[in-house]
Amino acid sequence: MSGKIVNYYDGSLECKGYLSVPKSTHDLPLVLVGHTWKGRSEFEDQKVAALNELGYAALSIDLYGGGVNGQSVEENQALIEPFIKDRQLFRQRLISAVEFGKTIKGVDSSKIALIGFCFGGLAAIELARSGYEISGCVSFHGLLNQSDQPFQKVNTKLLVLHGDKDPMVSSNQILALQDEMTESEADWQFISYGNTYHAFTNPAANDIEMGTVYNHDSDIRSWTAMSNFLEEVFSNVNK
């Protein structure tokens, strides 16, 4: 991979992202990549490379700060807990990453999107919920925990890509999210992949007891759905 580690800040907290901007004669759309509950890792950095192949600049972000990675289920749970409980913290951390992204040389600051996986999928939804406007947000097998913040008018287009057998998401949470997005006047899509568990895009996921299982077909289909969505939202800018 041809990217580099970059430091950016949320207040005084130093965050360590991974950035790659393909060579181009014009400024490129930027796609931010939100990480799983483990923290920013090679998985997200590989998504940066895959997004480069689609013609986009990409930045995998660091929501925890300091490049921290959890080493166990217990550590991962402890890392996400402050963000689940404090959505203002969550939103501010995300907005700081987006604002940094807008300053990157070679990036078209009017064309920004956020995609995320698992905890990062919730991050994509939470940024849309905040009312902060970017071109689009995409959630891959995201957690769907409801926010403690009041509904805002959602100004960002949202695509949610979900595994129908994901044990970490209840049917009530799905309905609540859909109702919330409709009430918030969002432009939203929700795609559910049959016979598909949590973490279906991660080839390393193989724990059926935990409900995290890679699914090749759903991985390919969801990436295609994301690609089509990004092409749409970036082409609609300024129209």
Language model feature labels by segment:
Residues 1-239:
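N-terminal cap/leader regions of alpha/beta-hydrolase-fold enzymes
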